[in-house]
């Protein structure tokens, strides 16, 4: 998988959410990661929820020229964590 991002957005994300996009790539290694389409008027965007070091993170990204372009990453909200756990249980049944 190829990743890309805006360097300034990466810097700001690390300051605001204490995670840089390079580290956030590990989110895609979670076998239980879930994907949700996120409506956005200018391009197709997606939400990915998964674990990095046993903590839940949420990434917003798009696909550009075959690469995953990370837009932002933050700790998952309660609603996102519930959705992740619900999907994880459902997949294992």
Language model region names:
Residues 1-93:
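Ribonuclease/tRNase effector modules and their secretory precursors
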